[in-house]
Amino acid sequence: MVADVRASRRSRASATPAAAPVARARASRVAPALVVVGLAIVLVVAGLAWRAGSTPPIPVASDAPVAPPTASAPQPPVARAAPAPPAWADEASCAGCHAEAARAWRGSHHAKAMMAPSAESVRGAFDGREFRHAGTSTRFFRRDDRWLVRTDGPDGKPGDFEVRWTFGWAPLQQYLLELPGGRLQPLQVAWDAPRARWFHLLPDEKAPPGDVLHWTGRYQNANTMCISCHTTGFEKRYDANADSFASTWRAPNVGCQSCHGPAGRHVDWARAKAGGRELADLPGERRGLAVDFAALGGRGQVEVCAACHSRRTELTASPTPGAPRLDHYLPATLRSGLYHADGQQLDEVFVDGSYRQSRMYRAGVACTDCHAPHSATLSRPGNATCTQCHAPQPDPRFPAAAGAYDTTAHHRHREGSAGAQCVACHMPAKTYMRIQPRPDHSLRVPRPDLSVSIGTPNACTQCHADRPAKWAADAVERWYGPGRRREPHFGEAFAAAREGRPGAAEAVAAIAADAAQPSIVRATALELLRAEPRAGERARLDAARDADPEVRAAAADALESLPAAARVPALVPLLADPLRAVRIAAARALSSVPRERLDPAARAALDAAQAEYVEVQSVSLDNPGARHKLAV
């Protein structure tokens, strides 16, 4: 249900990727007092103070300036030219040439991600019926051509609020109501389309007006959290002085240019070609394409989709489709609270972090190998999606997938039963927003033995809920042999590190250094090492030179807890890294080093990266977390 994930996205906290705006548990809430304190600090320091890190400054062993080796010395900072403004096209212009793609898209969840209210777009019953939750009445009704909701407002008094936009399509639909300051807020009472009923997304909560989890609260704001992945060409346009929004977008849905990029030059090319001439001066690809999927390859395609189908921090105000991901986003790691220790999804993490753990991702399998690109539905029904590759004669691109898998000898379940479905064992679903099951895209082999040892979930007892994990682990051993239990898994080391067990840091450092591990796993290992200043120094230093930018960014953060004499030579070259996420991580990790301990070239590079860090936080001043980061 990839289409559902994007069309139902609710976690868009730029500065704090763990914030989930609509269905977030109270355990992760931020007290309103912290917001006030953070704002006050920012006003005092004007947002320019640099944080000293999680530990006090570590003195450099020598009074001499610390510089990296000559071969790695950064070049003087070069002003980066502002990119040319994107040339957007009218979304309707695409259908003239791409009629079949447009037809498939019109029926997709992407097309219905956000719509103006109308008889066709509103699924909920606005017929005067009333829904009650925790003593609050919410009534849905129409007046003339307006869809209205009567419920408690920010002051706690009942008021009538007009639906400005629908949000999502199936299995649920929410409604955006407008508050002063250009704020669009998703009502927490949503429409359950399959059951034709209203329901509350937080049934166990009573968030009063003024609470950040009340539907009018700051952490329920769709301008900050949601709309960028429900629209095309979103511009948040937050005014920090007025604490207001003037948000705009090119199209109120996930349209062609959300994935293919601004199409103005491509339309110019198409019109010129139709007129019998070519435009030789078009920039970029020969057809004026902003994103050329044929040239991107499997992993490049995943990065385009991951712009929204991921839990991540936004680094720029206007991310460019098809640009290197870590220039515009910092993906969340497999941290506690988001993922189980073995990498299974826990919180709303939106597919990508799971998929990048998988063997399929490493083999180059792209999203469109399983999902039709424009309808976003599965390309084949049921197990046929999997057996196009996992078969005796697989797709020639993936010869390692050869084998007979859709058989009882493999899955050990009755043919045609629920247990015989590939996804039942390899993509167990977790339900979010109360009614939306989302399959885990790590496509893992079930490991009930890990459930026994570290308490993680497993697909077997998700179905056989009346059976213990050991029963399932014993069955797997009988079927596939004892070797399955002896296969090492990073989850064991991560679970030990999360619990602070002796010796865990050494095991985590070994994972960070293991190039065979997925980059998101190695980045998570490096993140865990931050709490262990004496462990894994070699792994951190080596990771700073890794080919993978996600690993380099995590290494920069992990190096912060090392003595300055050790970390500075590794961090200074990262100030000139090609990718923004790495540069600002290095700047943050060097902020506690006295400037006089750096040579002039290193100071200049640090100044440039620190300015970039301020710019990144300024993108998210609507989120108190960004203001807090600037202040400390």
Q: What are the roles of these predicted feature ranges?
A:
Residues 52-68, 78-83:
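Ser/Thr/Pro/Gly-rich low-complexity linker/stalk segments immediately outside membranes or between
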Residues 488-500, 520-534, 539-542, 550-564, ...:
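Structural detector for internal amphipathic alpha-helices that build alpha-solenoid repeat scaffolds
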Residues 518, 600-632:
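C-terminal luminal/periplasmic domains and tails of membrane-associated envelope-modifying transferases
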Residues 69, 74-78, 100-168, 172-179, ...:
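Primarily the internal scaffold of c-type cytochrome electron-transfer domains
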Residues 32-51:
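Hydrophobic alpha-helical membrane-insertion segments, chiefly the h-region
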Residues 516-518, 547-549, 578-579, 623:
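Short inter-helical turns and helix N-cap capping residues of alpha-solenoid HEAT/ARM repeat scaffolds
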Residues 1-22:
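N-terminal intrinsically disordered, acidic low-complexity segments at the extreme N-terminus
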Residues 502-513, 533-545, 563-575, 596-614:
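Amphipathic alpha-helical scaffolding segments comprising HEAT/armadillo-like alpha-solenoid repeats
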